[in-house]
């Protein structure tokens, strides 16, 4: 509905603050979808989404991560540059889904802002060293590594330190997580 009438956008933005979960998360999902199709319409609200990174509701934080990554391609004012460290600081979060959201959205940022590709690469290579927690196990780390390889594949042409990425990927070929091993093998067939 908002896609047909962007005058409704302020109401959807307000809905993210609703005390009712269904409204709050429904509105956030609408905004996430809109950010993919019409990032230019949401870009004037970039500060709103940046503030959502600090939400008490993890789901809103995850939505904000995706939205911000989608807005990177229209970020003429370089607002993302000011929050790069904050955004990628979530790689140290105790929750696997939070870390996976950063990793999964990283390629969008690297492609939208090629001058960040090396720094994004460095951040993604750090996933090897994230700490385990009750919400981020060794198996979770393997899932995150798989997401990192998929992200690298999307912007590999922009990466200067290709050998470091290849080494990272090679270290996962024999992973006990079958899909990680397969993803690593496919990456190496394509890029090595």
PLM regions and their residue ranges:
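N-terminal alpha-helical scaffold/docking segments in eukaryotic complex subunits
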Residues: 1-37, 152, 166, 176-192
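Amphipathic alpha-helical scaffolding segments comprising HEAT/armadillo-like alpha-solenoid repeats
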Residues: 3-16, 39-52, 77-90, 114-131, ...
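Structural signature of alpha-helical solenoid repeat scaffolds
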Residues: 32-33, 69, 107-108, 146-153, ...
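Short inter-helical turns and helix N-cap capping residues of alpha-solenoid HEAT/ARM repeat scaffolds
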Residues: 19-21, 56-58, 94-95, 141, ...
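Acidic, Ser/Thr- and Gly/Pro-rich intrinsically disordered linkers and low-complexity segments
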Residues: 129-147
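Hydrophobic, well-structured mid-protein blocks that either form specific transmembrane helices
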Residues: 57-105
């Amino acid at each position: 509905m908002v896609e047909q009438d962007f005058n409704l956008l302020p109401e959807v933005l307000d809905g993210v603050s609703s005390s009712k979960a269904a409204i709050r998360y429904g509105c956030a999902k609408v905004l996430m979808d809109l950010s993919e199709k019409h990032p230019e319409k949401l870009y004037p609200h970039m500060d709103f989404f940046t503030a959502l990174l600090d939400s008490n509701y993890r789901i809103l934080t995850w939505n904000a991560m995706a939205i911000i990554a989608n807005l990177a391609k229209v970020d003429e004012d370089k607002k993302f540059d000011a929050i790069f460290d904050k955004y990628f600081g979530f790689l140290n979060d105790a929750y696997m889904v939070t870390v996976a959201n950063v990793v999964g959205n990283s390629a969008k940022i690297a492609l939208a802002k090629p001058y960040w590709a090396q720094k994004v690469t460095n951040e993604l290579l750090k996933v090897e060293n994230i700490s385990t927690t009750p919400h981020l196990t060794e198996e979770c780390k393997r899932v995150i590594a798989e997401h990192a390889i998929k992200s690298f594949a999307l912007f590999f042409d922009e990466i200067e330190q290709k050998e470091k990425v290849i080494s990272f990927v090679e270290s996962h070929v024999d992973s006990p997580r079958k899909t990680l091993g397969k993803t690593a093998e496919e990456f190496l067939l394509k890029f090595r």
